[in-house]
Amino acid sequence: YDAITASQGLGIGLVDFTGIAQIILRVRVNKVGAGTQSWQLWNETDANEIGVIADAGAAGVKALQATFTVSLVGIKQIRVRAKSTTAGDDPVFLGAAVLPIVA
């Protein structure tokens, strides 16, 4: 992740994880090429992965979603990071949203 500058600028957010049991990540992307592209929800505050969506499907614009169980407490800065298994197929990020689910 963060191999190219564009991957480092995919937006950030602040979430208070106190009392949160799960977080839903939805990313809107334009998948280019045939490799597997991974979209990671990254806890920037603690330098830990919250979860990853791996997309090995067909190319094109799509919305991907996953739910991750969390056991974090307090306010964390989070961001989306991306990578591809194929060097020339840089992921194209179109937007993201997170939805915290209370325990």
Residue ranges and their predicted role:
Residues Y1-A103:
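Polar, enzyme-active/binding microenvironments
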